[in-house]
Every structure is written in C-alpha cells, then in structure tokens.
UniProtKB/Swiss-Prot annotation:
Family to which this protein belongs: Belongs to the FKBP-type PPIase family. Tig subfamily.
Gene: tig
Protein name: Trigger factor
Subcellular location(s) of the protein: Cytoplasm
UniProt EC number: 5.2.1.8
Keywords: Cell cycle, Cell division, Chaperone, Cytoplasm, Isomerase, Rotamase
InterPro entries: PPIase_dom_sf (IPR046357), PPIase_FKBP_dom (IPR001179), Trig_fac (IPR005215), Trigger_fac_C (IPR008880), Trigger_fac_C_sf (IPR037041), Trigger_fac_ribosome-bd_bac (IPR008881), Trigger_fac_ribosome-bd_sf (IPR036611), Trigger_fact/SurA_dom_sf (IPR027304)
Listed Pfam families: FKBP_C, Trigger_C, Trigger_N
Described function: Involved in protein export. Acts as a chaperone by maintaining the newly synthesized protein in an open conformation. Functions as a peptidyl-prolyl cis-trans isomerase.
Length: 428
C-alpha cells in the first residue's frame, strides 16, 4: 500500500492511498461471500450461486460497494498511521479507481489537529485566592441551615408578605379564553421565588386567606409557549391559606438536629468553619490550576479548526443533557421552559467550547515539549482509587471501562497542569 499526504490551506489535507490489487481481490472475495447469502437463482439453493454465474448475471460491479465497505476502514486507518497525522474530522472519500484485478486508489480529505506554537508557560504569574473563613461566613452558613430547617406555620389572620408560601387556586385567560396549563388547584407558591410570570406574585402581596382577585399580567416576549409570548393575560386567583416561615432558635438543640455528631452550637460552628475552610482551599486550588492553564493557552498560537469547536460543543450538549436527565428533565423540556432552541444554546456554549479546545491543545503541546508521560504504576494507582470510590473490583472497573485511554489521558493532563503550577509564580 502506498500513501501520500498533501497539506492544503489551514488544517486540511488530502491522503492519496493505493491498495494493491491482491488486497482488492481479497476484498471482492469477502464481499461475494457476504452478498451471495441472499441471492437465489433458478437451479441453485439460496446462497449457493457460483461466483462466475453471479458476475455474469449481476456484474462484478455489484460487489464493489461491499468490497469498499470492507477495504476502506482498514486502508484509511493504516494510511493515517503511516502519514503520521491526527484527523479531527470524518474523511471525505473520493474513489479514483476500483476495478477487479487492479489496485484501489482513493483520496481522503480530512481536517487535522493544528500545529501549536507555545508561548510562555513557565514562570506564569498567578494569584492564589484568599482562603480565610470569617465569622460572617460561618454566620451566613448558619442562617442558610436555619432556613433549611424552618417550618411553615399557618398565618390565621395575617396578610400575604414577601417570603410567605400561599396555597391558591388559579385560572388564566388570554383574549377571554382559558389556555392549556393555565389552571391549578391547591397550588403552593412561595412569594418572591420568581416561579410565576413577572408581576403575578407581587400582586398577591396584601391578600388574606379566603380572598379572591383578578390579576393582570403580560407573558414575556421570550416565553416558551410561542402562542402566549408577549400577550396580556388575566388570572382569577383564590387564596386558601397563607403560611410563614418559622425559623428555629440557634441553640444547642438546633445544632444536634443539624448534626448528630455534635452536642453544642459552638461545636457545630467549629465543624462549619472546618468545612468552609476545606471548601475554600479546594476552590482556591481549582482556580489556581485553571488560571495557569488559561494563561498558557492565551500565550500559545494556533488556528483551531471549526470542526473541533463543533465536536466539543456536541460533547458539552451531551453532558448538559445528562445533567438534566439526572434531574428528571431533558433538552426538549429545557428548550420549552427557557425559550431557547438548540441553535441558541450551541451559540451560547461556543465560546467555552473554543476555550476548552485551546486549553487541551496547549496542554498536549506542553506535555510533548516536556516529555510528560504516564507510567503503568500511576495508571494502576488511579484505577485502585476509582475502584474504591465506585465500590468495584479493579478487574470489574477495567471491564466496564473497556479502554484505559481515557484514564491515561486524564492523568497526563493532570500531571501537565501540576507541572505548570510547580513552575509558576504564585502571589498570595
């Protein structure tokens, strides 16, 4: 097999590949064995038609596409390896010659990884976040816990105030007609949560249990239900019940309710401080690592192919969909509620996708320049940590992973970022 690589403008190029005639004939043989299984001719059982008769009846050309399906993947993979290129797009294949008894010649136009010209990546000046935990931080966390443990208590004679929870019936009308999804009974709504259309919750303030009222609002222009977007609406509302949050006292009993391992409020505060300190330390470490990568990437020069940004956007979209599914949602529901569509979400993700690609290419170039590699021992240690976290045996984890390439790549990038941090100038 002969291979020729021709670089074109930008990051594109063309592979010209010639597969010898003997290999082509073997591909045709394999194609015939596959195709003949479904062929029936008078005088022959299904799948038993002789090759000569098949070619006389249908022509050898009838085998070409199946032969190409067999030959091309292997030939293309070998050509890529021989040419020493790293394609980032699917190839555009053009068959120049395919004939029995002759070699197969095809061209494959592909986009490859860009060349990266590294700038400064050692001695980068970065600031480390302040990890001090103040008394105010601890008090704010206590208030948050207090809110979490608050009880809703019915206000017998009180009026609706911001922060209260009301139980209501409502029915909405547009142009005098009810609309789908505009009616509910005994619906719990926290005033000030922003759950409803702008202006709805505010108009409930001051009402009492048992009162009825008509509320005038206008649907936002970007509302997910296009038939309602921008239209004025009237809601008939009845308040059944008004509830207010009753915060628990900040005392030792509260501390024991929050954390069974403590006996006093002071002990709870100490645990909160320790937890916040650990969180700030981790946050500072992450910010520092992100900063050195961002600076190194900004100093590097490269021409990123659009297809790499598209591929990364695809990956980000899949990750987002998976996170939504963990919350019982999906992309289609998200589009409905947010008023966005796939095109606008992709556009929103594009800048971050480009940053991710730039960072990955920069780290790859630095790892190559500094001969940063991952040892088998490091891979095994990482597998042991992962297996322990997932409560699996290492063998079972390997079976589930299939390939260890992802683990090796993650470790390599981690080591490369470690290198950048070690060789940076960190200001406190």
């Amino acid at each position: 097999m002969s291979v020729k690589w021709e670089k074109l403008e930008g990051n594109e190029g063309v592979l010209t590949v010639e597969v010898d005639a003997e290999k082509v004939n073997k591909g045709l043989d394999a194609a015939f064995k596959k195709v003949v299984k479904n062929i029936t001719l008078p005088g022959f059982r299904k799948g038993k038609v002789p090759r000569v008769l098949f070619e006389k009846r249908f022509g050898v050309e009838a085998l070409y596409q199946d032969a190409l399906d067999i030959l091309l993947p292997e030939a293309y993979a070998k050509a890529v390896e021989e040419a020493g290129i790293e394609p980032v797009s699917m190839p555009e294949i053009d068959i120049e010659q395919m004939e029995k008894g002759k070699s197969l010649i095809f061209k494959a136009k592909v986009t490859v990884k860009p060349e990266v010209k590294l700038g400064q990546y050692k001695g980068l000046e970065v600031e480390k976040m302040d990890t001090t935990v103040t008394d105010e931080d601890v008090e704010n966390e206590l208030k948050r816990l207090q809110e979490d443990y608050a009880e809703l208590v019915v206000k017998e004679d009180g009026t609706v105030e911001n922060g209260d929870t009301v139980v209501i019936d409502f029915e909405g009308f547009v142009d005098g007609e009810p609309f789908e999804g505009g009616k509910a009974e005994n619906y719990s709504l926290e005033i000030g949560s922003g759950t409803f259309i702008p202006g709805f919750e505010e108009q409930l303030v001051g009402m009492k249990a048992g009162e009825e009222k008509e509320i005038q609002v206008t649907f936002p222009d970007e509302y997910h239900a296009k038939q309602l977007a921008g239209k004025p609406a009237t809601f008939k509302v009845k308040v059944h019940e008004v509830k207010a949050k009753q915060l628990p006292a900040l005392d030792d009993e509260f501390a024991k309710d929050v954390d069974e391992e403590v006996e006093t409020l002071d002990e709870l505060k100490a645990k909160i401080r320790a937890r916040l300190e650990e969180a700030k330390k981790n946050e500072a470490e992450t910010a520092l690592r992100n900063a050195v990568v961002e600076k190194a990437a900004a100093n590097a020069e490269m021409d990123i192919p659009e297809v790499m940004i598209k591929n990364e956007t695809d990956r980000m979209l899949r990750e987002f969909d998976q996170r939504l599914q963990m919350q019982g949602l999906n992309l289609q529901l998200y589009y409905q509620f947010s008023g966005q569509d796939e095109a606008s979400l992709r556009e929103q993700m594009k800048e971050d996708a480009e940053k991710r690609v730039r960072a990955a290419l920069t780290l790859e170039a630095i790892a190559k320049a500094e001969n940063i590699e991952v040892t088998d021992e490091e891979v095994n240690k990482e597998l042991e940590k992962m297996a322990e976290a997932y409560k699996l045996s290492v063998d079972k984890l390997k079976e589930l992973l299939g390939s260890l390439d992802g683990v090796k790549e993650d470790l390599k990038w981690r080591k490369t970022v470690d290198f950048l941090v070690e060789h940076s100038k960190v200001a406190a």
